[in-house]
From Swiss-Prot:
Actins are highly conserved proteins that are involved in various types of cell motility and are ubiquitously expressed in all eukaryotic cells. One of its GO terms (cellular component) is cytoplasm. The gene is ACT1. It catalyses: ATP + H2O = ADP + phosphate + H(+). Keywords: Acetylation, ATP-binding, Cytoplasm, Cytoskeleton, Hydrolase, Nucleotide-binding. It comes from the Eukaryota. It comes from Lumbricus terrestris. This is Actin-1. Its EC number is 3.6.4.-.
Amino acid sequence: MCDEEVTALVVDNGSGMCKAGFAGDDAPRAVFPSIVGRPRHQGVMVGMGQKDSYVGDEAQSKRGILTLKYPIEHGIVTNWDDMEKIWHHTFYNELRVAPEEHPVLLTEAPLNPKANREKMTQIMFETFNSPAMYVAIQAVLSLYASGRTTGIVLDSGDGVTHTVPIYEGYALPHAILRLDLAGRDLTDYLMKILTERGYSFTTTAEREIVRDIKEKLCYVALDFDQEMGTAASSSSLEKSYELPDGQVITIGNERFRCPESMFQPAFLGMESAGIHETTFNSIMKCDVDIRKDLYANTVMSGGTTMFPGIADRMQKEITSMAPSTMKIKIIAPPERKYSVWIGGSILASLSTFQQMWISKQEYDESGPSIVHRKCF
């Protein structure tokens, strides 16, 4: 560990995308879908030296003949064999490093079950022979990336949304709230409302097209009802999108109706509070003395917070719920898609962090439960 040449690896395993790279870099080297695909029929591709599984972009490009599975659901690993394949792919194919030579910083969802983080630790030391590892909470890393140690993070990715209040670098578990509504649900909802317009999207391959439409054309309205009125009375909000086969489709109020479900989950038939209320409820679960710091440092992170207009809408909604004299500031850094990874890169390269790693020796002495004592 004393060697200067040994760079730590930072791997942020999201439900939708895996971000990986080297500590000290300002962006991840590899970003690929967290999917493992297996051939639907054995021996379809004659003479192609068919593999029994494909990971990431390769699985994505061959999706026509594969069954795709996401090993991470709602931010939590549910299939460890596939997860191992993703890590193997990360180290050997994407980063091209020997995992036994580098410490690894992994990320986990807030409120991750204890058994999950033990299993992660076990796989790193026993399967990949890591010299050292650490597990950090995703939202805390996003806050570090914004240069803060106190604030509340609204982290919304592909599989899950969390609001995590953090004080002096420590997450406050009693006030963390989780919302099972994220990017994947928005894509599904957009597929549904485009079908109502007469465009049919059903297969997993077509779902990727809809995800692209969502990322390129959707935005959050500041005033939903007013925007609906504008969309009904003029075509100024309409945009066209060219499908891979050359057909051009027009999309109107769907552009803001889709992300509106983040604020009104009833659109998806869910009874939960929207992201603005969830953030507010999370702040209200904290000690009254730190609320002021949380309102003034509300940080957005994750790909699902990338919609244009989301920060202004959030500002408006929280201002209407908070005490009238409260200063409210929503921080939405442009690189928030990768904030978690960037925070990990910062953390793993701090000199003060070097004594925090769990070493192979400590693991051999204590077993997987060491992770609860050293990572909190």
